[in-house]
């Protein structure tokens, strides 16, 4: 029997992965207090005791130009990690998200006899589905947030475990709408709309004008309408303000630094870009409309690559259209406003929608950190 402590290799490539990694380490330490954690870690993972061979910022690059500029460094780091983990022989290696970096690394380590886990499934079920074969070769197990992801991997006999979603664990089943309104300074009885035009430069550029024009149309129906716009950082805020000054200079809005979750909980309805925001909005029990537009060629390409009937996670989870999706040429102020209007009514339909949101929340609320830790320990080879 080896006297070496349980050793887990970890690589996180961005802030979301750092949060997941920290939760995983916490849960593992509860079960194995003397375990050692080592690899590429952000500040949260390091605060939980993970030894960082490299800082996470080294991997956190976005955009083709930036990636190309950093490629020699990224390849060097991956070669070095392959060598160091091969020498260390951790009991299990966990690559957290960052699939372009981690899946190749996982494959290298699996070939060297190390059990590997990929934590957070890439969207292989939606596009570039053939990646599933590479993932199957590179990993012993995929940890998936959503049940339809596991169903996809099962079709290809790739080991996958559905662990639930950490966001579903973090959010209450029945959020306090009035408390959120008090936090944001929204009147208790006012109609309230959240606008979330995305977190990326291109999204804010493509969507903000039509989202603002939609809000102007809704204000005509609801003179007391409060409009809250959470923006992820100062760059997006500045970009949004510039667009607003030319499109709707007289429209009164509450610009928020972050606070997307509070904005969703406080609102009667939300208009948002697709992505994780739609899942968060569902967990906030806020009825929504998804509006999205891309450059024409990008949309043409996406239509040929994307294999799913819907783009928003609430619809994918439900297996039916719960949430109206207005994409590309359908993403117009008139159509967006027409889809949003009924959501402000306290009707049986909106009540049923919120009940369905609660049911879906319960489906993916499984204590993901604990489930992930259990999956890691089950892959540890007997010594």
From Swiss-Prot:
InterPro entries: Glyco_trans_19. Its EC number is 2.4.1.182. Keywords: Glycosyltransferase, Lipid A biosynthesis, Lipid biosynthesis, Lipid metabolism, Transferase. This is Lipid-A-disaccharide synthase. Condensation of UDP-2,3-diacylglucosamine and 2,3-diacylglucosamine-1-phosphate to form lipid A disaccharide, a precursor of lipid A, a phosphorylated glycolipid that anchors the lipopolysaccharide to the outer membrane of the cell. It is an enzyme of class 2 (transferase). SUPFAM superfamilies: UDP-Glycosyltransferase/glycogen phosphorylase. Belongs to the LpxB family. The lineage of its organism: Bacteria, Pseudomonadati, Pseudomonadota, Gammaproteobacteria, Enterobacterales. Pfam families: LpxB (PF02684). It catalyses: 2-N,3-O-bis[(3R)-3-hydroxytetradecanoyl]-alpha-D-glucosaminyl 1-phosphate + UDP-2-N,3-O-bis[(3R)-3-hydroxytetradecanoyl]-alpha-D-glucosamine = lipid A disaccharide (E. coli) + UDP + H(+); a lipid X + a UDP-2-N,3-O-bis[(3R)-3-hydroxyacyl]-alpha-D-glucosamine = a lipid A disaccharide + UDP + H(+). GO terms for biological process: lipid A biosynthetic process. Pathway: Glycolipid biosynthesis; lipid IV(A) biosynthesis; lipid IV(A) from (3R)-3-hydroxytetradecanoyl-[acyl-carrier-protein] and UDP-N-acetyl-alpha-D-glucosamine: step 5/6. One of its GO terms (molecular function) is lipid-A-disaccharide synthase activity. The keyword Lipid metabolism applies.
């Amino acid at each position: 029997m080896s006297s070496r402590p349980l050793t887990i290799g970890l690589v996180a490539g961005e802030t979301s992965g750092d949060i997941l990694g920290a939760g995983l380490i916490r849960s593992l330490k509860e079960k194995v207090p003397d375990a050692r954690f080592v690899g590429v870690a952000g500040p949260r993972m390091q605060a939980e005791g993970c030894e960082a061979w490299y800082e996470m910022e080294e991997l956190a690059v976005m955009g083709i130009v930036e990636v190309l500029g950093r490629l020699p460094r990224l390849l060097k780091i991956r070669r070095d990690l392959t060598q160091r983990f091969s020498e260390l022989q951790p009991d299990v290696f966990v690559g957290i998200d960052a699939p372009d970096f981690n899946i190749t690394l996982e494959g290298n380590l699996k070939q060297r006899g190390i059990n590997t886990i990929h934590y957070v499934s890439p969207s292989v079920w939606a596009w570039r589905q053939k990646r599933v074969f590479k993932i199957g070769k590179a990993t012993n197990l995929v940890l998936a947030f959503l049940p339809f992801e596991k169903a996809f991997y099962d079709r290809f006999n790739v080991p996958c475990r559905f662990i639930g979603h950490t966001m579903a664990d973090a959010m209450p089943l029945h959020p306090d709408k009035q408390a959120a309104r008090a936090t944001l300074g929204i009147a208790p009885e006012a109609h309230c709309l959240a606008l979330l035009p995305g977190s990326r430069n291109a999204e804010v550029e493509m969507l903000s004008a039509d989202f603002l024009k939609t809000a102007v149309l809704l204000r005509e129906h609801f003179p007391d309408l409060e409009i809250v716009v959470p923006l992820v950082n100062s760059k997006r805020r500045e970009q949004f303000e510039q667009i607003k000054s030319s499109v709707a200079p007289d429209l009164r809005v509450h610009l928020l630094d972050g606070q997307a979750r509070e904005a969703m909980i406080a609102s009667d309805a939300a208009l948002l870009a697709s992505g994780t925001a739609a899942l968060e909005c569902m967990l906030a029990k806020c009825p929504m409309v998804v509006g999205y537009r891309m450059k024409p060629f990008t949309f043409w390409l996406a239509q040929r690559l994307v294999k799913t009937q819907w783009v928003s996670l609430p619809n994918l989870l439900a297996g039916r259209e719960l949430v109206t999706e207005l994409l590309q040429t359908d993403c117009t102020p008139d159509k967006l406003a027409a889809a949003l209007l009924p959501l402000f009514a306290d009707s049986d339909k909106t009540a049923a929608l919120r009940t369905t949101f609660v049911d879906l929340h319960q489906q993916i609320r499984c204590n993901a950190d604990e489930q992930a830790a259990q999956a890691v320990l089950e892959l540890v080879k007997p010594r």
